[in-house]
Amino acid sequence: EEKHLIDLEHIQARDRRYEFIAGLDVGYRDENVFVVMATNGEEFYLVDEYVSNETTTSTLAEEIQEKVDEWGIDSIYIDSAAQQLKADLAYDYDIYCENAIKSVNDGIAAVQVLIENDKLLVDVNKCGHTYSSLSSYKWNPKTENPKPVHDWASHASDAVRYAIYTHQKRSVGIFAV
C-alpha cells in the first residue's frame, strides 16, 4: 500500500538511534540489488537502494562501499548462494558480508507481518524500485508447495527479506539462553 511509501528524510545517515543493515541479492544475468535499512529493533525503514545489471565486481564493491561509508552499515546479509562474490568482497575490497538465512516462506512471512503492522516503511525519494518490487511480488500458483515467482520483482524483494529475516533471527539468537 502507498501508506508505506513516505519521506524518510528524518532518518539521517549514521544516526545511532538506529542500527543500519543491508541486504544484497546478486543476479549474475539478472539485476543486483543492495538495500539499506535503518531499524530500531521493531520497525524497519528502507532508506536507500542500489540496483544494477551485469555489473563488474569492482563496480559493485565501489557502490556498496559508498553506501557503507555513507550510512555506517553494521551488517550486510548476502544471498548464501553467492559465496564467490562474498569471498571477493572480503578479500579484495574489505567488505564483509554474512550469509542470509534463506528460509523463503518464513522470511516472506516475517516481511509480510511488518508490512501488515505498518512496521516496514520505504523512502519515497530513494527506494522506488524496491517499493515497486515489493508491491509486485507474486506467488506461483502452479507449484505444489507455495513458491514465489522468479521475475524482475524477486531480486529487490529477496534483498529486503535477507536483511530483515536474518537480522531478526540473529538478534533473537543474541538473547537466547
Question: Where are these predicted regions, by residue range?
Answer:
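Short beta-strand scaffold segments in enzyme catalytic cores
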Residues: 32-38, 161
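Mg2+-dependent endonuclease catalytic cores in nucleic-acid-processing enzymes, primarily RNase H-like
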Residues: 40-148, 170-176
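Short, well-ordered loop/turn elements at secondary-structure boundaries
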Residues: 16-18, 28-31, 71-72, 116
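Charge-patterned, long linear interaction tracts outside catalytic cores
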Residues: 150-177
